[in-house]
Amino acid sequence: MTTVSIIGKGTMGQAIAKVVTAGGNTAELVGREDAGKPLAGDVVVLAVPYPAVADVLAAHREHLAGKIVVDITNPLNFETFDSLTVPADSSAAAEIAAQLPQSRVLKAFNTTFGATLAQGTVGEGGPTTTVLIAGDDADAKATLAGVIEAGGLRAIDAGSLRRARELE
């Protein structure tokens, strides 16, 4: 059994928690009021908007070393909706990985809506929801894929962390 700490109690955080628990794993939902507290999970999901990531990392950095950290953000420029707010040769996940050298950073869940995750299918009776996973650590990807698949969804290895930009 895997324990997954999900930082963010919004729509995505709750949907991911539903997937985690559907597979018999444990989900810990973490909010602002929990800043600085130890995280129970070996897997930590950053289910917050990209502009909030810096504050989340500052509040939890010491508890992220050695953990699998899953970035679900899309660093979209919400003023123009036509570009990302990270450098052209980078991604939100790469920026997070640079700040967390002791963690195994993955990109996942950012191409799927919360409702689709919670429902488990694309539309009523449609195909099983698919979650793309990008990252450089095969064991970390296998751990996350196991949690996703146990929850009834499909997990696909999307390649290295360099692929995160395409997913964003």
Language-model regions, residue ranges each:
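Rossmann-like NAD(P)-binding element
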Residues: 28, 35-68, 72-80
